[in-house]
Every structure is written in C-alpha cells, then in structure tokens.
C-alpha cells in the first residue's frame, strides 16, 4: 500500500473509531488515564412524567460525579409497558458492556430473567420505584432497591385529606355527615396501588372522617384514563362526589381536567388529593384545584442511585446504615398542601431548571 493510501486508511480508521465512541452508549471507551462507568437505565415506560423526571435527575446526579479519573456514560431505554421487551432491552444493555443496571420493572413479579442475565455477567442491578418481591431481591447479593414506602404515602395522603375535611365543613356539601368519595387506583395488583388505596382510606376513617364509597376506578397511573373515568363518574353521580383520592398526581390531574371541562364552578368541585409532588400538581394545589399531594422525593432517590452505582463500580463499601437489610433504600415522603405549597413549588421550579 502506498503512503497516500495508507494515510487515508489511517484517517478512515480513526474516523470510524471516533464514531463508534460517540454512538456506542454503554460500550463507549475512554482513554487509558480515566475509568469509564457505564450505567444502563431501563424504565417501564417513557410516558410516566414522574419516572421521566427521576431518570433526568439520575442522569444529572451521575454527570455531577464525573471527575478527571472517572467518566460516566448513561444509556436509557424503555420497556414500553411490556416485560418481554424490557428483558430484551436489558440484554442489549448487557451486551453493550454496561457496568451497573438501574431498572424500573414493567412487572414487579417477573424479574427472574433480568436477574439471571445480570448475575451471569456479574453486573449489579439497582431496581427503582417498582419494588420486586422480596424473595427475588434476595436471590443474589448484588441486587438492590431504591424507592419509597407506599404504605407511608397512603397514610400521609389520608392525614392531609382528613385534616382538610375536618377543618372545612363545606366539603360535606349535602350535610349528611358523610363524605361521598371516589378513588382512582393506579394498577391492578400493583403493590404501591394496593398500599396507597388501603392506607389512605384507613387513615381517613381513623381520623374520624365518615366515608361513603361511590366508586373505585382503575386508571393505570394515566391522566387521560383518569379523565375518562371521572367524566363517567360525573355523569353518574354529579355533585354527589365530595372527595377524590388518587394513587398518583397524574390521575389526580385527570380528575382536575374532567372538572374543568364539566362546567362546574370551583365551589361545586370535590376536594382532590394526589401523590408524587409533580410540578403541575403543585401548581394545581396553589390554584385551589387540588388540595394536596405527597411528595415522592426523586432528587433524594436519584442521589442515592448515583452514589450506589459509583460505589459498586469502584468496589467501595456501602453505608450500611442507610440500607435496610443491606438491600433497600427508602426515601421519606413529604406532605404538601396549602400551608406549605410555596416552599415546595419554588423548590420544584429550581429542580426543573437545573435539569434543563
């Protein structure tokens, strides 16, 4: 090969190598003076605002942990509400050379294939938001969970709802001494939905709120589905609905949208409570369209996952005091209502701007 052809070949090889580095996601390589941590993040869907916000915050936290000796590459994929598809995406991440996997399961009862694939390649897994069954998480010492205690969120939601109802007699519109309510439930068989539903209602009753159930409706954590369910309930019950309890803010916002479109004046609306502390829900609380939410602290969870990913990669010891049974990290929920909405809304706006 003459020198000109050899030079072209070398340049072409370098160009291809650079392209591979840029496009390879988990498989990207760094120079020899720095280590590269490759983190694969696989969510159950790409249509959940809370999960999207948590993923963005995780990427920001990992970016902040880069230094001269450590580069961090984050690749994200969605399971699109299909466990089989999520399994395939996990396999792709493993084949691409990821060092740590952060997985938000489609089906919390079906992580076996993911665990088997990760264990075969000795890749630690941090499950988040959707807690696997305990027996599955205990299969291997490199499996972890980061999230919140769903029971706590249900209790807190019941507490802020009871406090509001007990101090606002106008909630009982028909003055029958009972609060007629509907409940928007996230997903059939989902542990968080079950716990939030059970403990929110129990806590209301424990705090001397006499309830009359009009309807429970499954809406799959989805705003559009919740709006459709509420449209039917409004047609059926009209102004009889005095309270809407929702397993998450997205569905609560669906209820808000239904009442906006129904033509009711604000005084005719029921009181509405959600869970997650989404910025749009906090704005609805500020506007008086919702009466409260329970903040699911995505920043705290993202910080913990990022720290764990780096520690696993570096082979460092965990702070065992922060992990229950050496496997679980639960961040604390926080109550948000009219009394502290400005504090949390300002904090949420700051977080949102930092993620841009």
Language model segments and positions:
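Extracytoplasmic "Venus flytrap"
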Residues: 40-61, 65, 75-88, 98, ...
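Short beta-strand elements in bilobed, periplasmic/extracellular small-molecule ligand-binding domains
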Residues: 64-79, 183, 205-220
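Short, solvent-exposed amphipathic alpha-helices that sit
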Residues: 50-66, 153-157, 191-210, 225, ...
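Hinge/cleft segment of the Venus flytrap/periplasmic-binding protein
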Residues: 35, 46, 177-188, 192, ...
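Short, low-complexity disordered leader/linker segments with a strong preference
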Residues: 1-38, 94, 116-123, 352-356
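Hydrophobic alpha-helical
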Residues: 58, 103-120, 125, 200, ...
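Flexible loop/hinge segments that line or gate small-molecule binding clefts
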Residues: 114-152, 176-177, 278-286, 291
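Hydrophobic alpha-helical segments within soluble ligand-binding/sensing domains
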Residues: 86, 145-176, 226-227, 277-281, ...
């Amino acid at each position: 090969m003459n020198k000109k052809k050899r030079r072209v070949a070398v340049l072409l090889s370098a160009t291809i190598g650079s392209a591979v580095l840029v496009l390879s996601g988990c498989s990207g390589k760094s120079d020899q003076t720095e280590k590269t941590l490759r983190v694969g993040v696989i969510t159950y869907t790409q249509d959940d605002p809370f999960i999207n916000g948590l993923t963005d915050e995780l990427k920001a936290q990992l970016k902040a942990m880069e230094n001269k000796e450590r580069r961090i590459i984050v690749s994200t994929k969605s399971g699109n509400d299909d466990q089989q598809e999520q399994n395939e995406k996990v396999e792709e991440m493993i084949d691409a050379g990821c060092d740590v996997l952060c997985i938000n399961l489609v089906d919390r009862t079906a992580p076996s294939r993911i665990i088997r694939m990760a264990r075969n390649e000795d890749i630690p897994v941090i499950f988040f938001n959707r807690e696997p069954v305990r027996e599955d998480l205990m299969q291997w010492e490199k499996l972890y969970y980061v999230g919140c205690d769903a029971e706590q969120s249900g209790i807190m939601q019941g507490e802020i709802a009871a406090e509001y109802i007990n101090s606002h007699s106008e909630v009982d519109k028909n003055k029958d001494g009972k609060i007629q309510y509907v409940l928007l439930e996230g997903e059939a068989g989902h542990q968080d939905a079950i716990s939030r539903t059970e403990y929110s209602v129990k806590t209301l009753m424990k705090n001397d709120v006499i309830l009359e159930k009009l309807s429970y409706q499954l809406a799959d954590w989805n705003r559009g589905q919740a709006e459709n369910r509420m449209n039917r309930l409004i047609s059926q019950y009209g102004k009889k609905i005095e309270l809407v309890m929702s397993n998450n803010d997205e569905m609560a916002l669906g209820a808000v949208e239904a009442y906006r479109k129904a033509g009711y004046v604000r005084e005719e609306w029921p009181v509405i409570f959600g869970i997650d502390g989404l910025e749009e829900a906090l704005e609805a609380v500020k506007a008086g369209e919702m009466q409260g939410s329970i903040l699911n602290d995505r920043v705290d969870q993202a910080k913990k996952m990022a720290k764990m990913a780096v520690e696993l990669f570096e082979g460092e010891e965990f702070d065992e005091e922060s992990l229950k049974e050496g496997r679980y990290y639960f961040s604390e929920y926080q109550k948000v209502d009219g009394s502290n909405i400005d504090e949390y809304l300002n904090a949420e706006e700051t977080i949102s701007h930092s993620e841009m």
